[in-house]
């Protein structure tokens, strides 16, 4: 460890969002470069910093600061420079010179203890004197707060958030109930609060601790796709987390109900527990769906005549179910169209669009992801947006301590949709594709922006994996039998020529897939050992498939069922990166969390970031479009890494350029190989899938079905045929607790009683 004490000569770089700075500090005639997070610092201040001396490949020796303390300038020249740096609003270089000339080394004491005397200086009024004193006091309080919070292991960034939220009240919060931080501050979850509580001396059986841990365990379940948990399962999870017996939790469950943080219901004679926000999302979603579910009488013969004109003009052939879907779309306010690959969903959507266009209706198209929206645009010839863009996601982050759904770790933080019940979407017809990916939060937001009387048509394959986020929306809606549903089942002639589509249906039906059959688009290469599987996958991706499917190597995707193991994404990505994008002297790279990110790497966003900004540039580098938000599953290529500014730039679909600070790299992972779960809503020219032994809960029919249906031109499976067939035979589905079906049936029952 090394220590540098001196004056901040110059702030060479500063990120105002997170306080990361590069400082030039003079210590005994020597210049040192300090890098780190400094929430509040100004040129001219005296700093004592401790950290590690590191050698930067471009910028030379630097002190990576781990802790520091700001000290008052000791001589009049330093005081004058500090005051004239802009650190105190209202004081420029000339006024700083007059103040220091008047009070000399006593300047800071005067500012703190006798601020009215500042009015003795020409150009300083009594009011200005008080404002200067207030600023000095605020900076002193902030620094004291930083020192106090850092003794509890709180990072500089979190310390700033805590102080800005509570002010001086933070001391009592930390010492009396640090678990309050998990409710109020983004980035502070239960575990951080629990560590602080242990240092403060709060007992493990504290009411605050049990209540906070119980709620945390419930919120953790939403990360696994659940909107609720059975009470017994919740108590077991919380008991393991807290090391407290389950019988002590009933009282705290009641307390959390009183605080309106959760809702307890009965299902099949047992109690289930919701985070309040998810219960009300389900309830309100059910109500809004019911309101849209209007039926109007139509002249069926007239509709069929119009439909015939459209199909003849557009040279479209519809089967009975597709024709029924069009009739249902005309006569109903809400319609679900579901079916597997090759069953004509796109043709049906196009026909519906043509029909409503002839009625001069305004039509909007959307899908959950950028890739899915792009596919929808290509298939229909009409612009499709992501649902987030359709609803106009916008806003700046704010802290909402009353947000009962706050995990303390992953919130919208004040982001909001401009389109809502007060500013609904201006459309007669809205068509949403890839509905299996839509979670309860997104459907709730969408429905709030849809006027009663607007037709809503939801399209998706119910046999795909459910959404990454909480809920099982499409399946619950269909299972409720409360809405019109058309299930397309016929595989059309052109689609029937594709072994991808034929075999996908065989997989979904649990039939045997012929793996030794010669095929142009569905290939199985037998390899028994992981090392051989990896070797063959590399050859396929680099040498064979790009020419075969006429695609860039980066567009060919390896998908695997698991994260861990020799054929998991973590091990595969390291090997694939070494093969496809090895280190080179001219390639910048950055290590973060055990992963090396290198210019040219393929990466994926692994959590929703609603606030991060993107821009599209023309060939001259001038921005021509901009917006906010990068979402879980978006993939891109690293275009640049700036070690001095500590930023990395990634290009996503549709040429969207996004700048990440190094502290945000935890939101990214390499994407040469991805989990099958992460492939939802995407389509690739070719996919390569390793097939080897793994946990039964992962090696399932709907997982391999999802993987196969992601390929447009070619599927290559490499591994053991018996394992593949075992996956086809394995109907096990991971349990997902979702209550939307029950809420829909409740609403229907209550409406019937009225």
Give the residues covered by each predicted segment.
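Conserved helicase motor core of P-loop NTPases
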Residues: 462-628
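Short hydrophobic/aromatic beta-strand immediately N-terminal to the Walker A/P-loop
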Residues: 335-338, 457, 557
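C-terminal accessory regions
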Residues: 625, 632-754
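Walker B catalytic acidic pair
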Residues: 434, 460
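ASCE P-loop NTPase motor cores of helicases and related translocases
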Residues: 247, 268-429, 478, 484-493, ...
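Short, conserved "post-DEAD/DEAH" coupling segment immediately C-terminal to helicase motif II
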Residues: 440-454, 472-477
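Loop/turn-to-beta-strand initiation segments
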Residues: 362, 426-429, 453-457, 714
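Accessory, non-ATPase domains that flank or precede helicase/AAA+ motor cores in DNA-metabolism machines
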Residues: 1-298, 302
């Amino acid at each position: 460890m090394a220590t540098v004490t001196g004056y901040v000569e110059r702030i060479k770089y500063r990120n105002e969002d997170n306080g990361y700075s590069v400082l030039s500090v003079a210590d005994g005639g020597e210049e040192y470069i300090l890098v780190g997070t400094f929430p509040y610092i100004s040129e001219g201040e005296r700093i004592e910093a401790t950290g590690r001396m590191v050698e930067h490949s471009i910028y030379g020796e630097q002190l990576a600061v781990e802790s520091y303390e700001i000290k008052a300038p000791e001589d009049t020249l330093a005081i004058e420079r500090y005051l004239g740096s802009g650190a105190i609003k209202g004081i420029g270089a000339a006024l700083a010179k007059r103040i220091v000339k008047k009070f000399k080394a006593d300047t800071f004491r005067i500012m703190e203890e006798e601020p009215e005397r500042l009015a003795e200086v020409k150009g300083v009024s009594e009011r200005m004197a008080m404002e200067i004193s207030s600023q000095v006091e605020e900076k002193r309080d902030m620094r004291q707060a930083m020192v106090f919070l850092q003794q509890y292991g709180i990072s500089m960034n979190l310390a700033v958030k805590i102080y800005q939220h509570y002010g001086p009240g933070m001391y009592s919060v930390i010492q009396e109930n640090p678990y309050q931080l998990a409710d109020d501050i983004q980035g502070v979850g239960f575990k951080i609060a629990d560590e602080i509580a242990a240092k403060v001396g709060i007992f493990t059986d504290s009411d605050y601790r049990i209540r906070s841990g119980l709620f945390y365990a419930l919120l953790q379940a939403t990360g696994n796709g659940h909107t609720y948990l059975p009470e017994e399962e919740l108590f077991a999870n919380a008991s393991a987390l807290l090391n407290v017996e389950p019988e002590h939790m009933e009282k705290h469950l009641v307390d959390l109900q009183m605080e309106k943080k959760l809702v307890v219901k009965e299902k099949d004679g047992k109690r289930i527990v919701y985070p309040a926000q998810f219960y009300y999302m389900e309830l309100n979603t059910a109500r809004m769906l019911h309101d849209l579910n209007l039926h109007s009488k139509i002249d069926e013969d007239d509709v069929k005549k119009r439909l015939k004109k459209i199909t003849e003009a557009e040279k479209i052939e519809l089967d009975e179910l597709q024709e029924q879907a069009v009739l249902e779309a005309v006569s109903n306010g809400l319609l679900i169209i579901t079916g597997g690959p090759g069953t004509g969903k796109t043709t049906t959507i196009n026909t519906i669009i043509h029909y409503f266009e002839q009625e001069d209706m305004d039509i909007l198209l959307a899908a959950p992801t950028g890739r899915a929206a792009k596919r929808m645009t290509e298939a229909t010839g009409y612009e499709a947006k992501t649902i987030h863009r359709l609803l106009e996601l916008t806003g700046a982050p704010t802290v909402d301590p009353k947000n009962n759904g706050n995990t303390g770790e992953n919130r919208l933080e004040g982001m909001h949709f401009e389109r809502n019940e007060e500013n609904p979407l201006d459309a007669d017809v809205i068509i949403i594709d890839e509905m299996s990916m839509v979670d309860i939060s997104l459907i709730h937001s969408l429905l709030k922006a849809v006027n009663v009387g607007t037709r809503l048509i939801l399209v998706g394959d119910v046999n795909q994996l459910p959404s990454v986020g909480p809920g099982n929306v499409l399946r619950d809606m269909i299972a409720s039998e409360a809405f019109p549903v058309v299930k397309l089942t016929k595989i059309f002639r052109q689609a029937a020529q594709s072994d991808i589509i034929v075999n996908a249906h065989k997989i979904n039906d649990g039939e045997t897939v012929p793996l030794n059959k010669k095929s142009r688009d569905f290939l199985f290469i037998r390899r028994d050992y992981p090392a051989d599987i990896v070797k063959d996958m590399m050859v396929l991706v680099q040498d064979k498939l790009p020419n075969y499917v006429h695609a860039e190597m980066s567009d060919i995707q390896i998908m695997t069922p698991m994260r861990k193991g020799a054929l998991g994404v973590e091990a595969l990505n390291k090997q694939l990166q070494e093969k496809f994008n090895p280190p080179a002297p001219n390639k910048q790279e950055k290590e973060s969390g055990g992963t090396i990110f290198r210019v040219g790497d393929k990466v994926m966003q692994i959590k929703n970031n609603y606030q991060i900004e993107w821009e599209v540039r023309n060939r001259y580098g001038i921005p021509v479009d901009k917006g906010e938000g990068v979402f879980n599953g978006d993939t891109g290529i690293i275009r640049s890494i700036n070690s001095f500014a500590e930023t990395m730039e990634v290009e996503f679909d549709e040429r969207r350029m996004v700048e990440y600070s190094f502290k945000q790299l935890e939101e990214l992972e390499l994407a040469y190989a991805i989990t099958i779960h992460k492939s939802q809503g995407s389509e690739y020219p070719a996919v390569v899938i390793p097939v080897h032994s793994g946990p039964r809960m992962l090696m399932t029919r709907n997982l391999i079905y999802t993987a196969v249906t992601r390929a447009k031109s070619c599927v290559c499976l490499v591994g053991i045929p018996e394992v593949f067939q075992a996956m086809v035979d394995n109907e096990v589905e991971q349990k997902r607790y979702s209550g939307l079906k029950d809420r829909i049936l409740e609403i229907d029952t209550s409406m019937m009683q009225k």
